[in-house]
Amino acid sequence: AYAEALGVDIDSLILSQPNTGEEGLQIADTLISSGAIDIVVVDSVAALVPRAEIEGEMGDAHVGLQARLMSQALRKLSGTISKTKTIAIFINQIREKVGIMFGN
């Protein structure tokens, strides 16, 4: 309803909510490789949680997993993106102070 009011063609919109970061990036890769779409938006990079982190125990250290996941995915996607001319937008967020919200 809201997207439609903004002019989004709902019938052409593909929405996916994957369980893991790997799944999400694989979906993006498949869509981009198909050449059938013009734009892919990943919102948000911070929500792309690596499988190892989801399947691990609370408190386990997973240093750099997300950074490695994104680095590998972007290396893989960049070639495909240049061939298909698909636009890929990755949305992220910046956190300057842990525990501080709303500009305080």
Swiss-Prot record:
Protein's name in the database: Protein RecA
Question: What functional role does this protein have?
Answer: Can catalyze the hydrolysis of ATP in the presence of single-stranded DNA, the ATP-dependent uptake of single-stranded DNA by duplex DNA, and the ATP-dependent hybridization of homologous single-stranded DNAs. It interacts with LexA causing its activation and leading to its autocatalytic cleavage.
Superkingdom to which the source organism belongs: Bacteria
Q: Which Gene3D superfamilies match?
A: P-loop containing nucleotide triphosphate hydrolases
Would the keyword Glycoprotein turn up in this protein's UniProt record? Answer: no
Q: What SUPFAM superfamilies does the database record attribute to this sequence?
A: P-loop containing nucleoside triphosphate hydrolases
The UniProt keyword set, sorted, is:
ATP-binding, Cytoplasm, DNA damage, DNA recombination, DNA repair, DNA-binding, Nucleotide-binding, SOS response
Q: Does the keyword Kinase apply?
A: no
Q: Name one GO cellular component term.
A: cytosol
Biological process according to GO: DNA recombination; DNA repair; SOS response
| Protein family per UniProt | Belongs to the RecA family.
An example of a Pfam family matching this protein is RecA
Q: Which gene encodes it?
A: recA
Q: MF terms per GO, please?
A: ATP binding; ATP-dependent DNA damage sensor activity; single-stranded DNA binding
The record's subcellular location field reads:
Cytoplasm
Species annotation: Lactobacillus helveticus
Q: Which PANTHER family match?
A: MITOCHONDRIAL DNA REPAIR PROTEIN RECA HOMOLOG-RELATED, RECA
